[in-house]
């Protein structure tokens, strides 16, 4: 298995120099799958299983949540796997990408974590709360704060909630917006942090299951998707790889190891 990891400066230089080709894939060309660290380990298991079945797959790991869609739209990768539909729709609206969900992956729990406090009642007035800074996942963080009873939001705003939609904030909490993949680092400094168990497990700094509150697995809009350009929907390599990801016992074991009980298979209903 071959895994390529791009840092932002390297990606920018490569794109500027035109080092990525946009040629159509050949039948025997490897399927290029873009992802981020949170989802890489189970995908690596799928890549290994695909190899056993004669399918060449190359995993391309990105360090941010912007480059995977840029690279997919440019044709540098064939599919990406890191985002749910609300995030995708926001990216399409912002950048004009012609990208579509192809198949569901997993849905992860997201929680509120605190190093200092054991309950929301213990949070002091003016407590600092770190949530994601992208438009969609910040809305998910605000929904969590509302579920915890720390704020109330305007009716019906859902995942599109912004700080302007906060109606009441009785503890006068101070909201800090941080890049989602960096939220785990805010655990030591903020009083309360929106946390993604997959990144917490990777960081190995605290227990991913120790959240004061999880958002539950009932919001299907947050299922992570395999995303493609529409023209690739009949690519047999893609169809086979997704089938392996969804049904291989080896991949399921890797998912269980990576996410514990804090995920659900989105293709299972």
Annotate each predicted stretch with a short phrase.
Residues 102-152, 252:
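A conserved helix-loop-strand patch within extracytoplasmic ligand-binding domains
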Residues 109-120, 222-237:
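A bilobed periplasmic-binding-protein/Venus flytrap-type ligand-binding module shared by bacterial periplasmic
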Residues 22-27:
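Sec/Tat signal peptide C-region and signal peptidase I cleavage site
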Residues 90-102, 115-117, 189, 194, ...:
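Ligand-binding "clamshell"
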Residues 59-70, 157-185:
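Short helix-initiation/N-cap motifs at beta->coil->alpha
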Residues 36-58:
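Short, polar/charged alpha-helical segment
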Residues 137-146, 245-266:
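Periplasmic-binding protein-like
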Residues 61-65, 75, 79-89, 106, ...:
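Beta->alpha turn/N-cap motifs
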């Amino acid at each position: 298995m071959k895994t390529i990891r791009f840092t932002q400066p390297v990606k920018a230089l490569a794109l500027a120099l035109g080092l990525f080709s946009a040629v159509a894939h050949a039948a025997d060309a490897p399927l290029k799958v873009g992802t981020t660290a949170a989802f890489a380990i189970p995908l690596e298991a799928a890549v290994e299983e695909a190899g056993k079945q004669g399918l060449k797959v190359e995993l391309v790991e990105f360090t941010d949540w912007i480059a995977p869609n840029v690279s997919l739209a440019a044709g540098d990768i064939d599919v990406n796997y890191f985002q749910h539909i609300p995030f995708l729709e926001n990216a399409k609206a912002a950048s004009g990408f012609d990208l579509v969900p192809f198949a569901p992956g997993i849905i992860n729990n997201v929680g509120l974590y605190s190093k200092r406090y054991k309950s929301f009642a213990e949070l002091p007035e003016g407590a600092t709360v770190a949530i994601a800074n992208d438009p969609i996942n910040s809305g998910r963080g605000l929904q969590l704060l509302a579920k915890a009873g720390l704020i109330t939001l305007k009716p019906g705003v859902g995942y599109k909630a912004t700080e302007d939609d906060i109606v009441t904030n009785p503890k006068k909490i101070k909201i800090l917006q941080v890049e989602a993949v960096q939220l785990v680092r805010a655990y030591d400094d903020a009083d309360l942090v929106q946390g993604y168990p997959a990144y917490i497990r990777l960081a190995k700094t605290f227990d991913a299951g120790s959240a004061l509150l999880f958002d539950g697995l009932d919001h299907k809009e947050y299922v992570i998707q395999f995303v493609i350009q529409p023209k690739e929907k009949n690519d047999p390599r893609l169809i086979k790889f997704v089938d392996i990801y969804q049904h291989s016992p080896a991949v399921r074991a890797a998912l269980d190891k990576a996410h514990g009980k804090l995920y659900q298979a989105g293709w299972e209903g």
